[in-house]
Each structure stands twice: as structure tokens, then as C-alpha cells.
Amino acid sequence: MSRLAIAAVTLMASAATYAAEPIALRDMGSFHVGGRLVEISGKPVKDVTFTPGGVPAKVDPNGTYQVEQMYVQYFLPQNEKGAYPLLLWHGGGLTGVTYETTPDGREGWLNYFLRKGWSVYNSDAVERGRAGWAQYPDIFKGEPVFLTTSNPFQRFRIGDGPDSYDPDPAKRKLMPGSQFPNAGYENFVKQNVPRWTTTDDATIAAYIAEIDRVGPCIILFHSQAGTFGFKVAQARPDKVKALIAIEPAGVGDPAKVDALKNIPTLMVYGDYIERDSRWPKIRATGGAFADAISAAGGSADVVDLPKVGIKGNSHMMMMDKNNAEVAGLIQTWLEGKGLTKK
């Protein structure tokens, strides 16, 4: 077993004591960032009754709207040990809840890294959660995409193949040795929110605005945010000190890979990649981009968790039962790159 895997196991063994220890903060808060103003005209004025039994009010939809902003909540530990703030970016159809807690009520990565002394900035991206979304098709083009309860069960490599989901947890067909907390799956899908496929440019602009406000930072991003994380780093290479890509569904601009050569990069992939028709291609795309970073003179480490003895992880590894073990591997990598304070 590699040094990273051994260290991760040690960290997992001590993680059980965390819940009894309070988290000491020097500050916490939130802000919105990014966005733009848009004019809408030519719409009819309507009478709207906002509250049952209330008095109707005239609502004129014509005018200026604030849209495409992003919400960020930050937590600053009393005893800061990270050399730079850690930004957490969620994946598609999700929000910052991804990192807050697990479907079965355990601590998420937000708390894990806070306890390790990192200042953590957790966001709801454009058109997600507390960022809000805009009218469509007037502003957002196309319709939002909604997922059924069963869709992520197979697509996120929790269930083993088609028809693996069942409303009864006991009847579900899980991947063999799955670490996902099956009994809490419905709590996970309650986190799912509508997503658009036409807002990438706005999302990248908002993430750039976040970095411009926060300053030099480390970005940990998941799934859909793979494209955002790499492209934002390519746009602000002087402000990004490390990239941690958790099963990135997309990558950056191959023509601008040189911009990443001074940014240490870690890619992490879970289990069962070969058991799903989509994931081998996604994994190959990420690996090829890591190779391109290395060829440009950069540092890109790719970790397939089963190969270092960490097995059973789904696409949602930050929620899996061994999430502290995976976080420990990331923490060890950050320490090895000199990104913690002495």
C-alpha cells in the first residue's frame, strides 16, 4: 500500500473522535459575487396574489434584473493551518450541500478540512441553490434539466447497472462492496436541484469573480465543475495555488495547458469505472489532460483509489462511508506539496 493510502487509513481511524470536538472559528459569513444586469421588455403586467386571502398586487415583469450571480459561504478556523483558502465547487445538479454533510448524517468534507485548519469557501454556483436562477428562455436559454430519483443511482456508480434502483433499500442492487450509504440515498436525491446546460460561460465568470475577491487559493472541484476549475485556473494562473479534481466530467482548454504548469494538480477517481459504459471515456479524458499538464512541465498526479487500496467509492466519494479516508489522502497530498503552514 502506498504512503498516501497508509496515511489516509490512519486519518480515518482518528476521524471518529471529531464529532465530539467543537470547531473553533474566528469568523464565518457569506457573500454573492459575479452576475450581470439584464433588461426585459414587452411582457404584460399581471395581478398577482402572493398570499392566500391577500390583496392582489400589480407585477410588471418589464425592467432590469440581476442575474447569474453566485453564492459563497465561508468558514475561517481559529487555528489556520492551510497556506491558502480552500474553495469547494460542487458538480452538476447539486449545490454546496455536497460538502456539508453526508446522506446518513456524518460530517462532510467541509468540516473535515475545517478541522484540519483550512479556511473553507463553499459555493452555490450560478443557477443553483442560494445563487438563484433567471427567467427562461428570456435570459437562460433552454429548459432546466431535472433528474428522476433513480437516475443518479446508476449514473453515479452506486447501483450496479440498469434497473438497480428500488424504492426499498433492501431490494437495491449495489455495486459489490459499495461505500455509499444506501439507506440514506433518498436524502441525497433531496439535494438534487434543476440544472441548465447553457450557463457555463456565466458560471466561469462568477467563479473568476470569486477568486478575484478571495485571492490566492486552492480549488477542490467535482464532476461538472472539472471544466470550470481548469478553465478558471487557466484564466487566473497567478491566483490558483493547487487544483484537486474529484472525478472531473470535463477538463480545461488543451491549447492553454501551459497556464497550468506551475499549479500542482491532483485528480482522484473512485471504483467501478470499468463497470459503467460512460466512465472509461470520462476517466481517459481526465488522464489525457493530466498527461498534457505533465508534458508542459507541470505536476499532475492521478490517483485511482482502488489502486492505492481504497475501494468501493462511488462518484459521490465525499458522501461515501469512507469519505474521511479519501479526504485524508487529499490532505496528505496537500501537505506533500508544501501547502500547509509550518
Could you say what each language-model-derived stretch is?
Residues 20-81:
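N-terminal cap/lid segment of alpha/beta-hydrolase-fold proteins
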Residues 106-132:
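Conserved alpha/beta-hydrolase
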Residues 245-305:
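The feature captures the conserved acid-bearing segment of alpha/beta-hydrolase catalytic domains
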Residues 82-92:
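Short beta-strand element of the alpha/beta-hydrolase
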Residues 220-229, 233:
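Gly/Ala-rich beta-loop-alpha elbow adjacent to hydrolase catalytic centers
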Residues 197-218:
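Conserved acidic catalytic loop of the alpha/beta-hydrolase fold
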Residues 90-102:
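Active-site glycine-rich loops that stabilize anionic/oxyanionic intermediates
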Residues 310-312, 316-342:
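Catalytic active-site module of serine/aspartate enzymes centered on a nucleophile-bearing elbow/loop
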